[in-house]
Amino acid sequence: MSQTLLDNLNKKELTETSCTIEIQAAFILSSLATFFGGLIVLFIFRIALKISRNWKTVKGPRGILELFSSRRIEVNPLRKLYFHGVFRERIEMLLSAQTIVGQVLVILVFVLSIGSLVIYFINSMDPVRKCSSYEDKIVHVDLSFNAFFSFYFGLRFWAAEDKIKFWLEMNSIVDIFTIPPTFISYYLKSNWLGLRFLRALRLLELPKILQILQVIKTSNSVKLSKLMSIVISTWFTAAGFLHLVENSGDPWLNGRNSQTMSYFESIYLVTATMSTVGFGDVVAKTSLGRIFIVFFTLGSLILFANYIPEMVELFSTRKKYNKPYEAVKGKKFIVVCGNITIDSVTAFLRNFLHRKAGEINIEIVFLGEAPPSVELETLLKCHTSCTTFVCGTALKFEDLKRVAVENAEACLILANPFCSDLHDEDNSNIMRVLSIKNYYPQTRVIIQMLQSQNKVFLSRIPNWNWSAGDNIICFAELKLGFIAQGCLVPGLCTFLTTLFIEQNQKVFPKHPWQKHFLNGLKNKILTQRLSNDFVGMTFPQVSRLCFLKMHLMLIAIQHKPLFHNCCSLILNPSSQVRLNKDTLGFFIAESSKDVKRALFYCSNCHSDVCNPELIGKCGCKNRSRQQLVAPTIMVMQSSLNEFAPTAEIYTSISREQTSSVTILTTRNMPVDTADDSDMLDSSGMFHWCRSMPLDKVVLKRSDKATHEFQNHIVACVFGDAHSSLMGLRNFVMPLRASNYTRQELKDIVFIGSLEYFQREWRFLRNFPKIHIMPGSALYTGDLHAVNVEQCSMCVILATPYKALSSQLLVDTETIMATLNIQALRISCPMSGSSKKEVNTSPTFSKYEGKQRYQQIPILTELKNPSNIHFIEQMDGLDEAIKGTSLHLSTAFSTGTVFSGTFLDSLLATAFYNYHVLELLQMLVTGGINSQTEHCLVKEKLYEGNEGGATFLSGRTRCKLGLLSLDETILSDIKPKKTFGQLFCGSLDNLGILCVGLYRMMDEGEHNSERKRFVITRPANECHLLPSDLVFCAIPFSITCDKSESNASIQDQDTTTNVTSMSQGSNFQGAQSALNEHSLSPASAMGEKKSPQLLNSRVYPLNLFDASDIDPGK
């Protein structure tokens, strides 16, 4: 036994000999000589090549060939170059791992490099100052590895275009300092560790190898592998250098200060140094080692402080956000995907969670395509009880399965309104919808869209179902629709906006008008099923009862005709429409608790109740309609005595009719001649004209005398040839609603780049009375050319998205144009004006002895609401609430500014109550909502069909207007001291529904510009002022002017009709439109047809894809 052990020791001594300084120097110098020698040769070759090229330029292209080339090369000098190029190209393909052979070669080189590193680890167990004998078998294995590395090095050198750059690459340095010593060991018959630790740098190729093997596929895994390879290769290389110098000692001391340090101890020392801890149990004693530790500590501060935390974060994030969401039975949740950023999530949570304040019972699962940022992660932690984040995409079935879309209440898709390409953003969201519907067709989807022309693709998805709650929120359609209403009536844009925003900021009003405005902000659009005690009653009766007894303003109902499948939303229906069972009502009220009174109302229990707070659920179970309707009407008649005008007022405008179809008569309908016959689209809802070439509508500054516009609409657009289309068709459609006669339509004059309008024109060419002035709103000459001084409204549309360094600059052009237009004030002396001029100009000062002036009415769109302070400064009023948001600003209260940022809140509205969203779409788009679109697409009604009854009712939509108390038909309502008296009197006698006021800010002298502010749903006891203007829902057949002879000519101050509202049968009007050459058939009940309708013709117009319009028409 002892003899065997002695033999092994003797054998090990034979294979290990002491390495002298000369042997170590031979290994080191071989690498240095190869490196510097090769570098010098390459430099000399490059200099010689430059000299030869210069010589070739001087002596001609054949100068070098004549001196150095043989005759055979002269005969065919390009043949060798051709084969050289082909061979080089094949090598490049091989080394880039683009072929299977190349991939095998790259993987083989990496594996052999790791094998060589393992051999180094084995040899490092022996003392560094000992040399292994060549009889060791491991030495032969390492020699074969390095021989293959030499071959691979030669291929890389051959394929390199820049040889010097290749020579200085890290992989080349590793090969130069590890391959030559191996061949030196073969010559010296001994092997030394030397610089073979540099093979550890080959670990940097690990991410590339893993990608070739398809082990890692995601960006996070690639990033994690790169960080790990950098840290590990740095550890091993630094430990190898310390292992070498500490065991060898300083060269100038002949190794007298060396110490025995194993490779594991070297790794331990490097790790302690990298973490900047340093326990002191293992330290460097050599000068070289200590100098290296100093520089390595500085480098490790960067490496450890950045890479290690990032690796931990990637590893934890991948594990944290890749877990599937566990749906709990009985707990509701929704999935939100698309544009998941800190801004979009903040806006969504603010609006969505506010709807259920105090009782959040719906969990929100965010499906993001990238891990959340630090800010987003912090926000989610603040709502950790109701939010979950999962990394994935809605385009993959496995990710949809992880978030359990099949069990979700709905899937909401967020859009990015600030993206550079709106069309691509819509397309990506449409693909998400298609993926979700393919995965689980019954999933309810609510999607945000940026451009209205892309909505048609969603309706073509086979599993898209409007009736199941699928809905579209189109930013361009709603935003431009709001602005269009503000163009038709001052303040209406603000009035409609206040009904859909949430105001939580606590403010303290300084002026009386601010108190009225803030009280109006408390009101919202709410829905509630009406009590069955209202069955059989007319809408005016129910609305009056709700207003007086419950202090609720009922403005619309959802009605389903007997012979029609689509439910229609009807604003202020006529007395012909009677309520059915479980009718859905739309109210303007402050809280959902208040509108519950309309559900609990009982004619038996609450007929004598005067306090609306006492109306609650009663114990009545069996109710008879015959017993309940009569008492209800008696209550209303008894309450009428206080507000009813005299019997001889407006007896000819009675709303009591027996026909089930609205009949228009000549006594209250403006008359047009046959020469001015209207042409409508096939739905009967919009005015239409034959396709107009663009050059026919382009105006010239020199022709101003030929187009003296008055009472027109000026729209300033800042797009160019490369801007995203904003969809001006959505702006024009509400202004061309068919419930206006052709004479009532206002000219629309666009100012902007002609190149931009050339791209938009195919969507506008079939709308009448549109003009284009090439130019800019920043140039005063262009404004004067379109007679902006005489316009009824000048709207400044926001600039299409541009990539800017600051979001505060997105409204620069808009603000500058506003400043430019506001500077154009028209002043004139008071003495030469007539009373009629004063009455019809609300912006004129009425104080004698003072010079009066008129400011051009402006409506400015802001993309960034924080820029409102620029507009406030222009207004010149110091009455704004300081430090508040846009919706509390003076400019917003007066209706001169609009921002579409509040449209984000409609996503929550669409989920909780999509009926409110449908009402909003109907209000701002001229009568089109999702139900209308569904019927139009399903029945292809835009192709035109025969029959006239539905066409007649298609034009009888209600329209909002702004009426004066003195100069219109409201002047005969007696009494009208309070808003409650006006509401009941106008509803009973005229069928007009009053919903708000447009009041002077101050009757004092300092309000020289006669600015007005909006009051949404005034209180019943609110006292009226003689100067008040009233927002009203006016039936189509009612003439608002006090003089019927001037019914078609309405002054701006006295009567301003606005947006078209879907009157009871507007969906019926979309069902069967007349074809191009047909006339309206006679109505029933022996009524005479209106000449206006007799001369109206209908032409087909695709409401959803304007590009399909036949240009030949």
Curated annotation (Swiss-Prot):
This enzyme catalyses: K(+)(in) = K(+)(out)
Q: By its UniProt entry, which PROSITE patterns does this protein fall under?
A: RCK_N
- Compositional bias, Polar residues, is annotated for 1047-1081
Q: How is its activity regulated?
A: Regulated by changes in cytosolic pH; activated by alkalization. Not activated by intracellular Ca(2+). VU0546110 acts as a selective inhibitor. The auxiliary subunit LRRC52 shifts the activation of KCNU1 to more negative potentials at a given pH.
- Which residue range or ranges hold the RCK N-terminal domain? 331-473, 710-881
Q: Which Gene3D superfamilies match?
A: 1.10.287.70, NAD(P)-binding Rossmann-like Domain
Give yes or no: UniProt keyword Mitochondrion: no
Q: Please identify the protein, giving its name as recorded.
A: Potassium channel subfamily U member 1
Q: Which organism is it from?
A: Rattus norvegicus (Rat)
The top of its lineage is: Eukaryota, Metazoa, Chordata, Craniata, Vertebrata
**Its encoding gene is what?**
Kcnu1
